A protein has these predicted regions:
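Detector for the c-type heme attachment site
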Residues: 173-179, 195, 208, 232-234, ...
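Beta-strand-rich N-terminal accessory domains
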Residues: 249-456, 473, 487
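Sequence/structural segment immediately N-terminal to covalent heme-attachment motifs in c-type
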Residues: 156-176, 205-209
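Extended acidic/polar, glycine-enriched regions
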Residues: 477, 485-541
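Central antiparallel beta-sheet cores of small beta-barrel/beta-sandwich binding domains
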Residues: 23-110
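Gly/Gly-Pro-rich "capping" loops immediately C-terminal to redox-active cysteine motifs
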Residues: 163, 175-205
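Beta-propeller blade termini and top-face loops
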Residues: 548, 553-865
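Flexible coil segments in periplasmic/lumen-exposed cytochrome c-class electron-transfer proteins
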Residues: 123-156, 167-168, 215-309, 526-565, ...
Length: 865
C-alpha cells in the first residue's frame, strides 16, 4: 500500500436522506483503518437491492474501491476489495450506529472502525453576512452552479491544487500555524471561530464576494475556490480546530442552491511555461524532432542506475536557447528558436513549434530523473562536439574529458575557443566568444520568404592569424553564405564554413531544412550582414517596472523577532520568486537576490525602517542560479554552467552584458548536479559546491565536489570530493570550510562537514574516483550527523558576525532547507576531530525552507531566503 497523503473524511457522498433509509445497514459509514501509527480514512457505502447488498469503500485519495463477494448475514459483514492493488478482506460486525472489524492484507490484519453518517440534531443555520459584493454582483457567474456536485467531487488532486493556491496566495495574509501572515487580523483557520459561516458553501461565499478586509477572489475559478476550501478544511481546521470542521452530510448537500453547471474548471497549472524568462534561457537541452527524434529513455533500477547510451543524443549541455520570432512573453512564448552551446561554441540546432520545450526537469515542472527536450519540428542540427575546428590544426577531433559512458564533457581549451559572455540589447542576443586569436560576435536570427523559414547566423570576426573552419549543418541541409572572405565546402558529411585571414568583415549564414527551395534568390533579397558592435553598448531596459511590497514586522515577545520581507510574487513576468541567494551592495539598504528560475533582483529599503521594499528585476535567463556574491560593487552569480559577472553598461540598473567570469564547469544532463552557493576568501578567490548524481555514480571529476575559482576567473581547482547534495559553502574564519550533505545513498544521515586542506574524501562512494576502502576509515568524519527527523535537508552554514545578536555573536548557524528552521551548531574539538551537535533557535519557524543568509553590515541583522 502506498502511503496516504493526509487523513481526510470522505466528502464524495451519495445522497441518502436520513428519513428515507429503512434498512439499518444501508447508507454511508465513515471508517478508519489503523496501520501502525498511520490512519487511513474514507467511507463504506452500502445499498440494498431486494435481498442483496452492493457496496464500495471510498477513500479520499484512492477513489472508489468496489466490494466484491459481499456477504451480510444479520449484523455481520464480509467482503473483498482492492486497496492500491493489494487484495484485501474486510470482516466485521455492526452494533447500532457502529462497526468494528479487521482488514486483512496478505498475512497482516489491521483494525477498522466505522460510524454511520447522520444528520446533526439541530440543522445548521449559517449567519447573516454583509459581504463586499452582493448576490446580484455574482449572479452571472454563480447563478447556475452545482455546489453540491462540486463539493461531492472533492479529491486528492483538488486538495493538491488547493494547497498550491493557498501556499502561493492565501499564505501571504493568513500565514500558517507557526508563522503569522502579513495581516495579523486575517482569519486563523487553525484556531479561530468563523464569523461568516464555516460550512463549505459559506466559505465559498466569503471567497467569491469578499468579507471584511478580504477582497473578492475574482481570479479563481469555481473549482479552484472549492479546491482551496478543501485544503483549508482538511489541512488546518480538521487537524487543529475540529469544532469548526463542518460535517458534510447528504441533507446538507440537498439544501444547497441547485444548478446544472460546475463552472470553469481549475486553470492548468504550469507556472514554469507561463513565466517570461526574457528572450533567452540557458539550460541543458536535448534537441529532438517531436515526430522523428530518438525516443526518450531512462535506465531502470536497481540503483545505482546504469548509464544510458546517450552518444547519439544531441544534448546542448550549456545551451543558450534564443527566441527568434518577435512578440511578448519571452522565450517560452515563441514559435522559433536556436540553441548555442557555449561549451563547444556550436549552434546545436534550430526548431519551430508550439511550446518551446517539454519543461521536464526538477527546477521546471518538478520532475526527477529527467531533462528538458525541444518540442516541434527540428530544421537542422549539429553533432555534440566542437563547433569550430582547432585553429592550430584544422581538426574537429574532440579533446575534452571522456566519461565512462563515452561522452565528452566540459569546455574546450581556452586557446581553442573561449566563451566571453552574452549581450542582451532589445530583442537582440549577441554571443561573444573567441576562436584562436579571433574575437567573434554572433547573432542568431530567422527570416521568412518564398514560403519557407530560413535561420540565420550573423558573425563579426576579427582578423585571425589562422584560417578558421566551422561546421554549419549536415550535408543535405540548404546552406548559403554572404560576406567577404567566407566560403562553404562539404567535408566528412557536413557543410563547413571556411573563413580566411582577412580584415574585419561581417558574414551571414542562411540555413534551411533539407528539401527546401534554393537559397540563391533568398540571399539576394535578404538584408546584408549586420555590424553587431552597436549592440554591445547597453540598450533600453527590458524590465522598467519597479514593484513595491511590505515588510511585516514580527512580534518581539520571544527570543527572536522575525520580520517577513515579502517578494513581489505578483509581477508582470510571472516570475515564481524562488529565492536562492542574497547579498548586499555597498549601500546596505540595497540587496541583490537570485532565483532558481534564472532571475536576479535588486531590492531597496532593507534598512531604512520605512516598511516598504522596492524591487527591480535586473537580470534574467540564467541557468539555475543558486548563489550570489557582491565584491567591490560587482555582482557575481553561481549558475550551473558558469560564474556570471553582471555588467550594467549604461547605468540603467539592468544587466546589458552577462560576462562569463568562469565557465570551467563540467555539465551533464543529470537533473541533480546543482552548482550551489558562492563565497569569497580574503584574497578574492571564489568557492562553490557541485552536487553529485543522486542515485547514480559520478561521470565527471566535478561531481560531488567543493570547487575554488581563482580571483581572476582563469582557473578552477577541486578542493574536496565525496559529496552527494552539497547545498552551499561556508568559509570559516581560518579559511577552512563547512559543507553540508544530504542523507541518501552512502549517507545514512545528513552531514555537516568541516573541511581542512585539500584532496580529502567525504563519504559518497558514488562520487568520482572514490577510495577502494568502503569503510568509514577511508572517509573524513563529519562535524555533525543530523537526523532526518530533525532536519531532512540542511543547506548552508553561516557564522554570526553581529553585536546585535548578543551572546550568539561569533557562533555558527545552520539553515534548514527542509523544515524552514535556523539552528545553532555547538562544536568542540577532541583529539583533532571537530565534533558537535545542532539545536533549533527557539521560536524561529519560517514559511519556507531557508537556503542562504547574510548579516547586513549596517543593521547587524540576519537576512535569509
Amino acid at each position: 500500500m502506498r502511503q496516504n497523503y493526509l487523513l481526510l473524511s470522505l466528502l464524495l457522498l451519495t445522497v441518502y436522506l436520513s428519513g428515507c433509509v429503512t434498512d439499518p445497514l444501508e447508507g454511508s459509514w465513515d471508517y478508519t483503518i489503523r496501520v501502525g501509527q498511520e490512519e487511513f480514512s474514507g467511507a463504506m457505502k452500502l445499498s440494498k437491492n431486494g435481498s442483496s447488498y452492493t457496496g464500495t469503500m471510498v477513500s479520499f485519495d484512492m477513489g472508489e474501491m468496489l466490494l466484491t463477494n459481499l456477504r451480510i448475514a444479520g449484523n455481520k459483514l464480509q467482503g473483498d476489495f482492492q486497496w492500491d492493488g493489494d487484495p484485501c478482506i474486510i470482516d466485521g460486525v455492526f452494533q447500532d450506529a457502529n462497526f468494528e472489524g479487521t482488514v486483512q492484507v496478505g498475512q497482516s490484519r489491521f483494525p477498522i472502525v466505522a460510524t454511520r453518517q447522520s444528520e446533526p440534531a439541530k440543522p445548521y443555520d449559517p449567519p447573516v453576512v454583509q459581504y463586499i459584493l452582493s448576490d446580484k454582483d455574482v449572479k452571472d457567474s454563480d447563478g447556475n452552479i452545482d455546489h453540491a456536485g462540486l463539493i461531492g467531487d472533492f479529491s486528492m488532486e483538488g486538495y493538491k491544487r488547493g494547497g498550491r493556491i493557498y501556499n502561493s496566495n492565501c499564505i501571504n495574509c493568513h500565514g500558517i500555524q507557526d508563522v503569522e501572515g502579513s495581516i495579523p487580523t486575517a482569519h486563523k483557520f487553525w484556531s479561530q471561530a468563523f464569523k461568516a459561516g464555516y460550512d463549505p458553501f459559506s466559505m465559498y461565499q466569503t471567497i467569491s464576494k469578499g468579507y471584511g478586509v478580504m477582497p473578492p477572489q475574482l481570479t479563481l475559478t469555481h473549482q479552484e475556490k472549492y479546491d482551496v476550501i478543501l485544503y483549508i478544511r482538511e489541512n488546518f481546521i480538521k487537524k487543529s480546530n475540529n469544532d469548526q470542521y463542518f460535517p458534510v452530510t447528504p441533507a446538507y448537500l440537498a439544501r444547497l442552491p441547485k444548478g446544472s453547471s460546475k463552472g470553469l474548471e481549475a486553470k492548468p497549472y504550469h507556472p514554469w511555461s507561463d513565466m517570461d524568462y526574457g528572450n533567452f534561457l540557458i539550460n541543458t537541452y536535448e534537441l529532438a524532432d517531436e515526430k522523428t527524434g530518438i525516443k526518450r529513455f531512462h535506465s531502470p533500477g536497481p540503483t545505482p542506475y546504469p548509464d544510458e547510451d546517450y552518444r547519439q543524443n544531441n544534448f546542448a549541455y550549456k545551451g543558450i536557447a534564443v527566441r527568434l520570432d518577435a512578440g511578448p512573453g519571452g522565450v517560452s512564448a515563441g514559435k522559433a528558436w536556436m540553441i548555442f552551446d557555449h561549451d563547444v561554441m556550436r549552434v546545436a540546432g534550430a526548431w519551430t513549434g508550439e511550446g518551446f520545450i517539454d519543461w521536464e526537469g526538477i527546477l521546471l515542472n518538478d520532475k526527477h530523473e529527467t531533462y528538458p527536450r525541444t518540442i516541434g519540428q527540428l530544421h537542422f542540427e549539429t553533432p555534440v562536439g566542437p563547433g569550430w575546428a582547432n585553429p592550430s590544426t584544422g581538426s574537429f577531433e574532440d579533446p575534452r574529458f571522456t566519461a565512462r559512458d563515452g561522452r565528452h564533457f566540459g569546455p574546450l581549451p581556452k586557446t581553442w575557443a573561449n566563451y566571453k559572455g552574452l549581450y542582451h540589447h532589445g530583442d537582440n542576443v549577441i554571443i561573444s566568444y573567441s576562436v584562436g586569436n579571433a574575437a567573434i560576435l554572433e547573432k542568431l536570427g530567422m527570416e521568412r520568404g518564398a514560403g519557407q523559414i530560413v535561420f540565420t547566423r550573423t558573425l563579426n570576426i576579427s582578423p585571425s592569424r589562422e584560417s578558421l573552419k566551422m561546421r554549419v549543418a549536415a550535408v543535405g541541409t540548404n546552406v548559403a553564405v554572404s560576406g567577404n572572405g567566407a566560403s562553404l565546402k562539404e567535408e566528412d558529411g557536413y557543410v563547413v564554413l571556411h573563413v580566411s585571414t582577412f580584415s574585419r568583415a561581417p558574414i551571414k549564414l542562411f540555413i534551411a531544412k533539407p528539401g527546401s527551395s534554393s537559397l540563391d534568390e533568398f540571399v539576394k533579397r535578404a538584408s546584408p550582414p549586420e555590424l553587431l558592435d552597436r549592440y554591445t553598448k547597453g540598450g533600453a531596459p527590458h524590465y522598467q517596472e519597479t514593484l513595491n511590497t511590505n515588510v511585516t514586522k514580527g512580534k518581539e515577545d520571544g527570543t527572536f523577532a522575525v520580520d517577513l520581507l515579502t517578494p513581489p510574487f505578483q509581477n508582470p513576468w510571472k516570475s515564481r520568486m524562488k529565492l536562492s541567494g542574497i547579498d548586499f551592495m555597498k549601500n546596505p539598504d540595497i540587496g541583490v537576490l537570485c532565483t532558481t528560475d534564472g532571475d536576479v533582483w535588486k531590492v531597496t529599503g532593507l534598512t531604512n525602517n520605512k516598511g516598504i521594499l522596492t524591487w527591480k528585476r535586473i537580470a534574467s535567463g540564467l541557468f539555475q542560479p543558486l548563489g550570489i556574491k557582491v565584491l567591490n560593487e560587482k555582482i557575481y552569480v553561481t549558475c550551473r554552467d558558469q560564474l556570471v559577472l553582471l555588467r550594467d553598461l549604461n547605468g540603467d540598473d539592468e544587466t546589458d552584458f552577462y560576462e562569463s567570469f568562469n565557465h570551467d564547469h563540467q555539465v551533464t544532463d543529470h537533473f541533480h548536479e546543482f552548482a550551489m552557493g558562492l563565497q569569497a576568501d580574503k584574497a578574492g578567490n571564489l568557492y562553490y559546491a557541485k552536487s553529485g548524481r543522486h542515485a547514480r555514480e559520478a561521470l565527471i571529476p566535478q561531481h560531488g565536489t567543493l570547487l575554488k575559482v581563482s580571483k581572476d576567473g582563469s582557473a578552477t581547482e577541486i578542493i574536496a570530493t565525496g559529496f552527494r547534495a552539497a547545498n552551499g559553502v561556508c568559509i570559516n574564519p581560518d579559511e577552512s570550510f563547512i559543507v553540508t550533505d544530504q542523507q541518501g545513498y552512502w549517507n545514512p544521515m545528513n552531514r555537516v562537514n568541516w573541511i581542512e586542506g585539500k584532496g580529502k574524501f567525504y563519504g559518497n562512494m558514488w562520487g568520482y574516483n572514490p577510495p577502494a576502502d568502503t569503510s568509514g576509515a577511508a572517509m573524513e568524519q563529519p562535524l555533525v550527523w543530523v537526523d532526518m527527523e530533525f532536519d531532512r535537508s540542511p543547506s548552508e552554514l553561516l557564522w554570526v558576525n553581529s553585536k546585535k545578536w548578543g551572546a550568539l555573536d561569533g557562533s555558527l548557524l545552520s539553515f534548514s532547507y527542509g523544515y524552514g528552521k535556523i539552528q545553532l551548531v555547538l562544536l568542540e574539538e577532541i583529539n583533532g576531530q571537530k565534533q558537535g551537535g545542532v539545536v533549533d533557535l527557539p521560536g524561529v519557524k519560517l514559511l519556507t525552507g531557508v537556503m542562504r543568509g547574510r548579516f547586513n553590515p549596517s543593521d547587524g541583522q540576519l537576512y535569509a531566503c
